[in-house]
Amino acid sequence: KGGFQQFAARHGLAVVCPDTSPRGSSYPGEHDDYDFGSGAGFYLNATRAPWNETYRMFEYVRDELPRLVQEQFPVDTNRAGIFGHSMGGHGALMMGLRYPERFRSISAFAPISSPSNVPWGKKAFTGYLGEEERSWEEYDANRLVQAGHRCAHEILIDQGSADPFLHEQLQPWVFESSCREAGQPLKSRMQDGYDHSYYFISTMMQDHFQHHADILTGEV
């Protein structure tokens, strides 16, 4: 839908797309909202019941999925990057900053880059982790940068100026400020007139694949 296939083929990159949440469970309220439960697992390990039974997407992306890919496909998992959109962008930034030796390149489209500060993130973190905000910090890209986590290469972020979630839910300037203060290289581009949709993603997709290819093939 985002039109990545041609760019993946051009650069010789395999693309692995994990789901937003685990499947097969049926907890009360799990399927009610697009921004929680089966619509948005936020790539963390839940600690609150009942979510802690299966909502362990952090471990899945960190451990199980890379191992499965390595076993089943002829790819070099030592040269891996990570990227995503919106909540997936949150996951990409968070995972990439926590495990820079595993994910050498990072990019995101309209990410939730400071989830502890916005309604989407507060709802998810409270629901999955509880109200103690200290437990949120390890899953918040903005807090991770402030705590000293780094990506050795420049992070690329694209954000649409007409995104309806820009001011309430995304607030990229918060993450930008933390990166400046911490010395984390970041290219954050505000794209005039674009919204939160796949048209925005497909327009910028080529640049993101070039970003990852340059780093993963040793050209940067």
What are these regions (language model features)?
Residues 1-220:
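Non-catalytic cap/lid and distal C-terminal segments of serine-dependent acyl enzymes
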